[in-house]
Amino acid sequence: MSKLYLMSLGCNKNLVDSEIMLGRLSAYELCDEPSKADVIIVNTCGFIDSAKKESINAILDLHEQRKKDSLLVVTGCLMQRYREELMKELPEVDLFTGVGDYERIDEMILKKTNLFSNSTYLQSENSKRIITGSNSHAFIKIAEGCNQKCSFCAIPSFKGKLKSREISSIIAELKDLVARGYKDFSFIAQDTSSYLFDKGEKDGLIRLIDEVEKIKGIRAARILYLYPTSASEALIKRIIASEIFVNYFDMPLQHISDNMLKIMKRGANSTRLKEMLNLMKSAPNSFLRTGFIVGHPGESEADFEELCEFVKDFGFDRVSVFAYSKEEDTTAFDMEQVPFKVINKRLKIIEKIVDEVIEKSFEKEVGQKRLVVCTGESSEGEFFIAAKDLRWDREIDGEILINESECGNLEMGQIYECEILQNLDKKLLAKALRKVDAN
C-alpha cells in the first residue's frame, strides 16, 4: 500500500479541507514520517506574512526529507493567492492546486496534473472526511468565502464571495458523524453569522441551530468566528437559550476605538460592540474569545491606549493579538504605514496585558465544577489525563489535567463532571467526580 504524509497549516477551516482530501485518499496508508511517504501533501495558509513564510519553509523542508520518486503536492490558500509566482519559484514541487479541487485530489495525483478551478470548493453531504485529532470532536464548515470588506484582509480576493452550504447538507454530515461516535462540534466559516445571507436569509444561523438541536446524540456545540455586524441580538439570545450550543462566544473584534473601527471598515462602532459583548457576558457560564490587530495604518497612540484599557477591563476569557501584516489586494496596503518599531513596541505592551487577562480567567475556574471531555494523555505525561472544558474549542482554549478520579478509570471521549482544584501556569488541575451520560 502506498504511503501518504499530509501537513495541514493555518486555521481549522484548512483542517477540514485536509480531512476531505484524506477521505479521497483513503486507499493510502497514513504515515508520520515524510521520508517514508510516496505522496506528500502540504495544505498551505496564505493569510498573513508569517503564515506565508511558514508554508514556504514547510514545503522546502519536506522536499529535503522526501524519498526519491515521491510526489510533493502543494495546495491551499497560499497556492490560490500566488499561483503564478510559486509555480515559477518552487521547482521542488511536483503538483500544484488551489482551493477549488480538494475532492479531485485523487484524480490529480493519479494523472499527475495541476488543477486550478475558478470557484472555491464547497463541501457537500457526499464529501467523505477522515476526522483527525479527536475521536469525539469535529469541525463543521458551514460556508466558504466572505462578503465583508475589512481593510486589512485579503481573504475575499482568493476565497471569493460568501457561499453557504445547504442546511440539509450540514445536517446529513452531522448525523453521519454522530453515528460514527462524534458528539462535540465546532461550527466554522470565515464569517459564521452571515450564514445563508447569500441566499437572502438573515436568520440562517438561527434556523441551523434549530435543526441541529433535533439530532439525538450531540452533547455540545459551539459557533466560532461571529462577525460584529452580521451577529444579531436574536442570534446571541438563541445561543443562550440552546441546550446543545454552549455559551461560547468567539467574535474577533480587531479593535475598539471608533476611529480604528471606521478605518478598518468593520461596520460597527464601539457602542454596538460593547452592547453585544455585554449580552454575551450575561449568559450563564459564558466564555468569551476575541482577537485584535495592533499597528494597523491610522492607529494613533490614543487609539492603542483605548484598546489596552478595554482589554484590561472587560474580562475576556481568551484573547489573541496580532501585529498588522501589510497584504496585497487590501485597502490598507496603500495607506501610510505605522513604523515597524512602533508596531513591535505596542505588541509587547498588549501581549503583557493579554497574559494577565487570560491568567485571571484561568484563576477564576478554581473551585468550579465543570463538565469536561477526556482527550487522551496530557502534555505533562502519563500521570495526568488530558481533558477540555465542554465549553471550549479543541486545543486553542487550554488543557485540563486530571490526576484524581472518584469514578474509576476514565474513558477517552467520555464526559465527566470535574472539580477544578488548581491553576498551574494556565493549566487546570482537576478531580473527576462522576461520569455524565451522553444525551
Curated annotation (Swiss-Prot):
Residues 132-363 form the Radical SAM core domain. SMART domains: Elp3. One of its GO terms (molecular function) is metal ion binding. It is an enzyme of class 2 (transferase). It catalyses: L-aspartate(89)-[ribosomal protein uS12]-hydrogen + (sulfur carrier)-SH + AH2 + 2 S-adenosyl-L-methionine = 3-methylsulfanyl-L-aspartate(89)-[ribosomal protein uS12]-hydrogen + (sulfur carrier)-H + 5'-deoxyadenosine + L-methionine + A + S-adenosyl-L-homocysteine + 2 H(+). Binds 2 [4Fe-4S] clusters. One cluster is coordinated with 3 cysteines and an exchangeable S-adenosyl-L-methionine. Its cofactor is [4Fe-4S] cluster. [4Fe-4S] cluster 2 binds at residues 146, 150, 153. Its EC number is 2.8.4.4. It is found in: Cytoplasm. Keywords: 4Fe-4S, Cytoplasm, Iron, Iron-sulfur, Metal-binding, S-adenosyl-L-methionine, Transferase. GO terms for biological process: tRNA modification. Belongs to the methylthiotransferase family. RimO subfamily. Catalyzes the methylthiolation of an aspartic acid residue of ribosomal protein uS12. This is Ribosomal protein uS12 methylthiotransferase RimO. The gene is rimO.
